[in-house]
From Swiss-Prot:
Disulfide bonds: none annotated. Keywords: Cytoplasm, DNA-binding, Repeat, Transcription, Transcription regulation. The keyword Cytoplasm applies. This is Transcriptional regulator MraZ. Residues 5-47, 76-119 form the SpoVT-AbrB domain. Coiled coil: none annotated. GO terms for molecular function: DNA-binding transcription factor activity; transcription cis-regulatory region binding. Its main location: cytoplasm. HAMAP family: MraZ. It is found in: Cytoplasm, Nucleoid. GO terms for cellular component: cytoplasm; nucleoid.
Length: 143
């Protein structure tokens, strides 16, 4: 399971050091794609396969489904972790997520999310994070 929050610096070549716990779960090669909320999603090859199977079931007659699939798959790339534990974030993905100098890498169960520092701090101060609202949503979900 992928959990935790880590802050890292992006080097001049657009690389970040992937936390060792995440490298263990993701493997030497993994898929990085555009995520929701202007962050990036990273999946192990195994989890990507599971996700693909679910997404294959979306109705191609649905414009929204086709748009989502294009967004999700066109932005995807296979990344490789080098011997120093670094991974290159492609320029188009850095631009999409607003990544410049520093990033937050978080674990969300079966995926990682890579956030620009600015976007992550905004997300964490968002009014949606009130304890009462979260508690209410958890109750609605049966948690």
């Amino acid at each position: 399971m992928l959990i935790g929050e880590y802050k890292h610096v992006v080097d001049s070549k657009g690389r970040i050091i992937l936390p060792s716990k995440f490298r263990e779960e993701l493997g030497e090669r993994f898929i990085l794609t555009k995520g929701l909320d202007n962050c990036l999603f990273g999946y192990s090859l195994k989890e990507w396969g599971v996700l693909e199977e679910k997404l294959k079931k979306l109705p191609l007659t649905s414009k929204e489904a086709r748009t989502f699939l294009r967004f999700f798959f066109a932005g995807a790339c296979e990344c490789e972790v080098d011997k120093q534990g670094r991974v290159l974030i492609p320029q188009n993905l850095r631009e999409y997520a607003g990544i410049q100098k520093e990033v937050f890498i978080i674990g969300v169960m079966t995926r990682i999310e890579i956030w620009s520092e600015n976007n992550w701090l905004k997300e964490m101060t968002n009014e949606n994070l009130s304890v009462d609202r979260i508690a209410q949503k958890m109750e609605e979900l049966g948690i």
